[in-house]
């Protein structure tokens, strides 16, 4: 009976326009909340499992390793059917001299005195199947190989088996130690019982000044030589010459066979010149492009790729790994890796340039091994403009590159920036963790308030050794520091001590288990960790810091956040007391004041 009476109230409530609005807004907010906080469950209805169809099953088999590599942070998905991708930026490869925007088929060039400019040349070679019934493709960036890989699976005939699908794999990379070389590797696998035909073509620009192309021949080998120009400031122009391997327009792949092709492109660009010097400059650029193309034609493709891959692998020996993120302003692992890849792709690598003199190389390596006074100031971990989650295109990417170089130069890392890609990686690594080299030691001066995030910095150069430093959390969510060393050259003793250096410095070893240091916070605030080759220097530090107190991290945080002030709690208590006094007064007046009603009726009253 009680429930029926309560249910009768609802129609009356809904008859009010105000109540209907409140109900509608509440329902809308519930839907939004459910979408945001149950994203993985909700999206599983739309992105359920691998891509469907014969070609989709084939693609799933071809890319099974991608998921494992993505979990390790070595790969980021650009596009994958049936799944959300984390790539929010241009699909590009570069080496500091050229940038190829694979997604938009654009070529950007730079010179010693001028930053990157967009050309009107289309560098990609397109391989289009003839007669495919269905096609599925996926693209990913491989950081340690410095390339973009696209896999396409083609269903050529009605079949129930994915094993009959034709696979086309394309690798794109701008060679790391050969700054003028762009490579597109094509591999076609045809396991079916029929001949498969492909059209080979390149896209011509629809607008702008086109490149003029001629066919050149060197020792029975043909290649295309394209020439064009780019207008820059002050009425000057940059001349661009591109030599590209000449391919057939139509290709047939026999049954049960594979086909491999490597398309080399050699790109030379001039310094800004006056229009009157075009003829002589073009002649020099063409000769340089022909010479390098001739060298490439006599090289093994495997050797060329190994050169490139080894350098990128060495670059990513250093890096940043986010293990646990507890706030919204800390960049994710993928955002960090993509940003590192972009910045390295825009930078030259003079340390691997064969024409660099031994004297210059030794000088750059000394900068890399001990970057004195880098990085000064606070950590860049939460600088969202330096670690953006998305980029609109190459133009914004180049602006980010300029911002990173400017930031590092102004924070004492000018020598690292001059060392090119290798130095830029070290500078970004030091800046993220708040690491700084001084005259005698390396210090970790991260803000104690951000240590609720767990992360690791690997491959920090100290002399010729590599230091790995991690901020980890124990079972009680309390932070501690883990340090390990990978010795590269002759054994040099390294020592470390935590904030204040009250305890005897510990000698660091190459043991896998590493060394653990507590997080101590001093007053006034000093670095959380010191690392040095000079034991006496660390022992003397304790006498020169002049500290008031040293607290454990949790004690420091407790003092920082002691709760709300006394005045607030006094006000709340006063309001509660006044409310109860007011309530007591109402009850008293009702039953005990003048004109109060009796609590119980007399028997005479009940008989009336």
Swiss-Prot record:
One GO CC term on file: membrane
UniProt membrane topology term: Single-pass type I membrane protein
Signal sequence bounds: 1-38
Major localization listed first in the record, in broad terms: membrane
Subcellular location: Membrane
Transmembrane portions of the chain: 564-584
Extracellular side: 39-563
Residues in compartment: Cytoplasmic: 585-608
Cysteine disulfide partners in this protein: none
Domain of life of the source: Eukaryota
Residues of this chain annotated as glycosylated in UniProt: 337
Keywords noted in UniProt: Glycoprotein, Membrane, Signal, Transmembrane, Transmembrane helix
Protein name: Uncharacterized protein KIAA2013 homolog
Source organism per UniProt: Xenopus tropicalis
């Amino acid at each position: 009976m009680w429930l029926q009476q309560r249910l009768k109230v609802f129609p009356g409530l809904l008859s009010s326009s105000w109540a209907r609005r409140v109900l509608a807004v509440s329902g809308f907010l519930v839907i939004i909340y459910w979408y945001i906080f149950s994203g993985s469950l909700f999206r599983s209805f739309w992105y359920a499992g691998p891509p469907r169809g014969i070609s989709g099953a084939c693609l799933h088999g071809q890319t099974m390793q991608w998921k494992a590599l993505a979990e390790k942070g070595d790969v980021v998905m650009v596009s994958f059917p049936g799944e959300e991708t984390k790539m929010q930026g241009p699909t590009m490869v570069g080496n500091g001299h050229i940038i190829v925007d694979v997604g938009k088929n654009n070529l950007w060039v730079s010179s010693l005195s001028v930053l990157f400019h967009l050309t009107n040349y289309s560098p990609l070679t397109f391989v289009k199947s003839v007669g495919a019934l269905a096609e599925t493709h996926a693209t990913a960036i491989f950081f340690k190989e410095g390339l973009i890989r696209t896999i396409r699976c083609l269903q050529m005939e009605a079949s129930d088996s994915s094993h009959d699908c034709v696979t086309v794999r394309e690798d794109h990379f701008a060679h790391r130690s050969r700054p003028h070389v762009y490579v597109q590797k094509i591999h076609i696998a045809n396991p079916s019982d029929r001949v498969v035909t492909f059209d080979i073509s390149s896209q011509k620009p629809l607008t702008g000044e086109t490149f003029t192309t001629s066919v050149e021949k060197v020792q029975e080998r043909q290649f295309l030589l394209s020439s064009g120009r780019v207008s820059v400031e002050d009425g000057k122009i940059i001349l661009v010459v591109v030599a590209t391997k000449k391919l057939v327009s139509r290709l047939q792949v026999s049954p049960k066979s594979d086909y491999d092709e490597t398309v080399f492109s050699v790109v030379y660009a001039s310094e800004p010149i006056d229009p009157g010097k075009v003829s002589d400059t073009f002649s020099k650029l063409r000769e340089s492009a022909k010479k390098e193309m001739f060298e490439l034609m006599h090289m093994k493709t495997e050797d060329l790729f190994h050169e490139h891959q080894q350098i990128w692998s060495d670059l990513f020996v250093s890096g940043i790994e986010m293990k646990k993120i507890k706030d919204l302003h800390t960049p994710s692992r993928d955002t960090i890796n993509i940003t590192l890849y972009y910045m390295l792709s825009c930078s030259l690598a003079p340390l691997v340039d064969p024409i660099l003199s031994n004297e210059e190389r030794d000088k750059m390596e000394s900068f890399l091994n001990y970057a004195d006074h880098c990085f000064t100031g606070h950590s860049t971990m939460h600088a969202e403009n330096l670690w953006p989650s998305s980029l609109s295109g190459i133009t914004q990417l180049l602006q980010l590159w300029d911002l990173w170089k400017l930031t590092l130069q102004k924070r004492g890392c000018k020598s690292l920036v001059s060392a090119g890609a290798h130095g830029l990686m070290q500078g970004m690594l030091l800046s993220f963790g708040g690491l700084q080299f001084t005259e005698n030691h390396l210090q970790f001066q991260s803000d104690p308030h951000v240590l609720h995030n767990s992360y690791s910095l690997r491959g920090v150069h100290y002399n010729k050794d590599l230091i790995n430093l991690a901020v980890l959390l124990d079972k009680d969510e309390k932070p501690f520091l883990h340090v390990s060393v990978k010795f590269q050259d002759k054994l040099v003793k390294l020592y470390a001590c935590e904030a204040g250096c009250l305890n005897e410095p510990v000698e660091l070893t190459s043991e896998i288990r590493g060394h653990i240091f507590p997080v101590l916070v001093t007053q006034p605030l000093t670095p959380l960790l010191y690392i040095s080759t000079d034991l006496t220097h660390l022992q003397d530090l304790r006498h020169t810091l002049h500290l008031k107190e040293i607290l454990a991290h949790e004690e420091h945080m407790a003092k920082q956040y002691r709760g709300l002030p006394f005045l607030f709690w006094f006000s709340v208590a006063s309001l509660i007391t006044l409310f109860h006094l007011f309530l007591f007064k109402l009850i008293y007046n009702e039953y005990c004041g003048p004109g109060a009603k009796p609590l119980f009726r007399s028997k005479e009253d009940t008989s009336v």
